Amino acid sequence: MSMRTEYCGLVTEHLLGQTVSLCGWVQRRRDHGGVIFIDLRDREGLVQVVCDPDRAEMFATAEGVRNEFCVQVKGLVRNRPEGTVNAGLKSGKIEVLCHELTVLNASVTPPFQLDDDNLSETTRLTHRVLDLRRPQMQHNLRLRYRVAIEARKYLDEQGFIDIETPMLTKSTPEGARDYLVPSRVNAGQFFALPQSPQLFKQLLMVANFDRYYQITKCFRDEDLRADRQPEFTQIDCETSFLGEQEIRDLFEDMIRHIFKTTIDVELDAKFPVMPYSEAMARFGSDKPDLRVKLEFTELTDAMKDVDFKVFSTPANTKDGRVAALRVPKGAELTRGDIDGYTEFVRIYGAKGLAWIKVNERAKGRDGLQSPIVKNLHDASIAAILERTGAQDGDIVFFAADRAKVVNDSLGALRLKIGHSEFGKANGLVESGWKPLWVVDFPMFEYDDEEARYVAAHHPFTSPKDEHLEYLETDPGRCLAKAYDMVLNGWEIGGGSVRIHREEVQSKVFRALKIGPEEAQAKFGFLLDALQYGAPPHGGIAFGLDRIVTMMAGADSIRDVIAFPKTQRAQCLLTQAPSPVDERQLRELHIRLRQPEQPKA
């Protein structure tokens, strides 16, 4: 008989009366009245093994096994006794009467029980091998595998070719910091790990491969958050001779296919499309969570002439904004709740949080409760009530500052209230999946520190045709042929139509204050390729980690990556990064500079 004939979790009634050989780990060992029960676990689940004292040698072995021992069991599949069926297990109607028990490897006492749901992330990541044995982690990584398989199936059916691109490439810092790799044979020179395969996939389009994809690692040396890792995985795609709408349709279908085939979720038949300007105006975010039924009300123009300087000053400032957020039934929020929200918005740069409770709208000023009402004239109050549509029992929150501060703070407050227990109880948030496309992004953003424009996405994104003239006259007016797919407030994919003409790419570099010599040094290979009849092309990249995190309902992408890094970009399992010896550094022509000691 083979070492293993069946997986533990797949032993069911169809094997009744048969002898099976199982391998796995001891989840739990119980001694009941002289009979030993072992819950045996493998990747497919659990099966109950019964060890009877009639088989003395086997029973003696069973008495010595402990949790996480790796064992082999040979035995007879039989029905469980009446009243002992476990409906929660696929194998819950049967058990295996053990004939032979072999310890394949003993285990020291684990540092935690695998069913402990209150482990710290540090403990889990330090003992990641044991953490990965837990059913939820097994589920997450198998879900990840299925998502990748379904993406490959779809792309294969659509004529895409899987082509690998280099991991050791050229550093072209235009965004996040690169991870650098020193070259031993080229002293003083460095490779960079790719932040994306962007330029190589464009070159593949010039090379007539027409449709490319790759599920690949990307690397960015940036500060980490719950949805970031220094190395992450993209479903990276590029296609020739398709316009923006056609590209969106193609990959919208892919995401629908993946959700249906992996978790049996039917996404919208057609995703809504929202311009960036509308998303920022209504939600203060370019990745709005449409499950939350709260929206901003624009008040900037109505607050220009009020005596209340908190509102009028930003209303009359070039980059200022005044916006309101009406919360239905919010008048029941306590002063403690409001104080908590006030402290919360300070995280995003807000200096405070103004509010008005609407007790009786018909009474006008006298029906309102607020510390700011005395600073507003009747016309301003009427404008606020009219524009927000506030009703009796509502509360209206206000933000007034630079537009970025208003958008960030009020946008975060919108999500916090919507997803709170109050929000759920009052129908301010829906369940389910709310996808959309956000389009027409600004081509450039102005960097005050560098006193120049920088690319909002990357410098290879095509401007909209009607905005080409602005590249040399007013870059800030340029909109890009860029698009992000957003799902429940997460950007799960982003892409654009690319620049395929060398003269346009050179104009974009000039708008970014990248001179001809610098452009040739950094991107000469691209500029050269674009001169050989480069086709119109565009693409998109999806964050595999993010998609699986959402599907699994996980708190962090670290829960869907086998061996992730911490928020300090460290691997607690292997203790990477770590020092290297002096000999290796000499071979790489590197001398470390010791950090300066603080002066006493």
UniProtKB/Swiss-Prot annotation:
Pfam families: GAD, tRNA-synt_2, tRNA_anti-codon. PROSITE patterns: AA_TRNA_LIGASE_II. It catalyses: tRNA(Asx) + L-aspartate + ATP = L-aspartyl-tRNA(Asx) + AMP + diphosphate. Its main location: cytoplasm. ATP binds at residues 220-222, 229, 491, 543-546. Residues 198-201 are annotated as: Aspartate. It is found in: Cytoplasm. Gene3D superfamilies: Bira Bifunctional Protein, Domain 2 (3.30.930.10), GAD-like domain (3.30.1360.30), Nucleic acid-binding proteins (2.40.50.140). Its EC number is 6.1.1.23. Aspartyl-tRNA synthetase with relaxed tRNA specificity since it is able to aspartylate not only its cognate tRNA(Asp) but also tRNA(Asn). Reaction proceeds in two steps: L-aspartate is first activated by ATP to form Asp-AMP and then transferred to the acceptor end of tRNA(Asp/Asn). HAMAP family: Asp_tRNA_synth_type1. Belongs to the class-II aminoacyl-tRNA synthetase family. Type 1 subfamily. This is Aspartate--tRNA(Asp/Asn) ligase.
